[in-house]
A protein has these predicted regions:
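Beta-strand elements of well-folded, non-transmembrane domains
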Residues: 13-15, 61-65, 78-82, 94-96, ...
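Short amphipathic alpha-helical segments
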Residues: 16-22, 132, 136, 140
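Short, solvent-exposed secondary-structure boundary motifs
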Residues: 1-3, 30-36, 63-70, 90-95
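Hydrophobic pocket/interface hotspot
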Residues: 20-24, 30, 78, 113-115, ...
Length: 154
């Protein structure tokens, strides 16, 4: 049985694609809208020869599993070429990787944001990780849409 699960999460965010993309690229902003993230710290940056900005973060999540509140810290890398889709990579223990591609497409006066997540996880955790990631990112995009709709403190 495959250790890989894929999910696609789509939302419409009021705002121009460049503004939505720029806001999303600063992972410290996501702490305001992601239901699990409690801390974000940028730990490195690099610029690839093709102009892709690569930014590394340490992210701390808090979640409840089987009635237990757990807190864990993991690495996230965001790779953003000057234009187009961005790539994300989250590495969590034990042997969990979330590989993402995020696109920002103009839709009238708004932006359609689409995230394709490929989740690699050991069998006992696969369903939990996929469900939690999909729910958390759906809620994150809904909170982003609400924030952009009000224009509050972007």
């Amino acid at each position: 049985m495959s250790r890989i699960v894929s999910r696609v999460i789509t939302a419409t965010i009021p705002g121009r694609p460049a503004a939505v993309r720029a806001w999303y690229l600063d992972l410290t902003n996501l702490r305001r809208v992601h239901p699990l993230i409690v801390a974000v710290r940028q730990v490195g940056t690099a610029l690839a020869a093709d102009g892709t900005a690569i930014t590394d973060y340490l992210v701390t999540d808090r979640m409840v599993v089987a009635g237990l509140r757990i807190r864990f810290t993991y690495r996230v890398q965001i790779s953003a070429p000057p234009e187009g889709p961005i790539a994300t990579l989250a590495r969590q223990a034990p042997r969990i990787r979330l590989v993402g591609q995020v696109t920002f497409t103009p839709t009238g006066d708004a932006t359609t944001i689409q995230e394709t997540l490929t989740i690699h996880a050991p069998w006992p955790l696969r369903r939990l990780v996929a469900t939690e990631a999909e729910q958390a990112h759906s809620r994150m995009f809904a909170a982003m849409a609400a924030l952009f709709a009000t224009g509050a403190d972007l």
